[in-house]
A protein has these predicted regions:
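Carbohydrate-interacting/catalytic domains
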Residues: 1-132
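Short, compositionally stereotyped local motifs that mark structural "simplifiers"
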Residues: 125-207
Length: 207
C-alpha cells in the first residue's frame, strides 16, 4: 500500500500541525498513481482535486499499472524526475518537478495530462483515444482535449456528444482538438479512427 498523506500527517491546527504536505499536492499524487503498488489517495486530496486525480487514475487503469509493474528511471535531476512504468496494457511515463512541463521524452510518447510540476505521457503503441477531463459533475461549461494515442500518423478521432456510438462517418477530429462541453448533461463518446475502422471507444459522462 502506498500513500503520500493520511490523517496521521495532515495539518490539524496551529498547535497541532503534524507533518502535512504543504505544496505540490497534485504532483505528489501524480507520482503516487503512476508507480507500482496499491495506491491510496487521501480523502481530502480527492475532495479538493477530484477531476485531476480521477484522470490520473484513468491513465493508470488504461495502461494497466499494477503492484509489480517495472520502473525505468529516465531522469533524476534536482529539477526533474521522470520514469516510465510498464503496465499490462501499455507504458506510462510520469515527470515531476519544476521542469516537468518542458520535458520532451521522445516521439513515441504522447502527453495526456499536465499540471503544476507534473506531466503524464503514454507510449503511442497503445492505440487508444483519450479525453483529458474525467466524467463527473461540473458547475459550469468545460473544455476538453481529445488525443489520439497511436503510432499510426494517419490516426484520427471520431466522436459524438449525444451518447450514440461513433462510426467512421461521425464527426472527426485531429489529435489535440478541443471541445466545449456545455453546462448540463453531455455524454461524450470518442473512438480511434484508423482507415475506416473505429476502435477502443471511450465514454465520458458530464453533468
Amino acid at each position: 500500500v502506498t500513500f503520500v498523506e493520511n490523517h496521521d500527517t495532515e495539518y490539524r491546527s496551529a498547535s497541532e500541525q503534524q507533518d502535512p504536505i504543504r505544496k505540490d499536492t497534485l504532483a505528489a499524487n501524480a507520482y503516487l498513481l503512476a508507480m507500482p503498488g496499491t495506491p491510496c489517495v487521501f480523502l481530502k486530496h480527492w475532495q479538493k482535486n477530484k477531476a485531476a486525480i480521477k484522470s490520473m487514475i484513468e491513465v493508470r487503469n488504461m495502461t494497466g499499472i499494477h503492484s509489480q509493474s517495472m520502473v525505468y528511471n529516465m531522469s533524476n535531476l534536482y529539477n526533474l524526475y521522470a520514469a516510465s512504468v510498464t503496465g499490462s496494457d501499455g507504458k506510462l511515463l510520469v515527470a515531476v518537478g519544476p521542469n516537468a512541463a518542458a520535458y520532451a521524452p521522445g516521439s513515441q510518447w504522447v502527453k495526456v495530462l499536465s499540471g503544476n510540476k507534473y506531466a503524464y505521457f503514454v507510449e503511442n503503441t497503445i492505440n487508444r483515444p483519450w479525453v483529458d477531463l474525467a466524467s463527473g459533475s461540473y458547475p459550469n461549461a468545460q473544455r476538453v482535449t481529445l488525443t489520439a494515442i497511436s503510432d499510426n500518423s494517419a490516426a484520427k478521432l471520431v466522436y459524438t456528444t449525444d451518447g450514440t456510438t461513433p462510426t467512421a462517418s461521425s464527426k472527426q477530429a485531429g489529435s489535440g482538438t478541443t471541445l466545449d462541453i456545455p453546462e448540463g448533461t453531455t455524454v461524450l463518446k470518442v473512438g480511434l479512427l484508423i482507415g475506416n475502422t473505429v476502435s477502443n471507444i471511450i465514454t465520458r459522462n458530464y453533468t
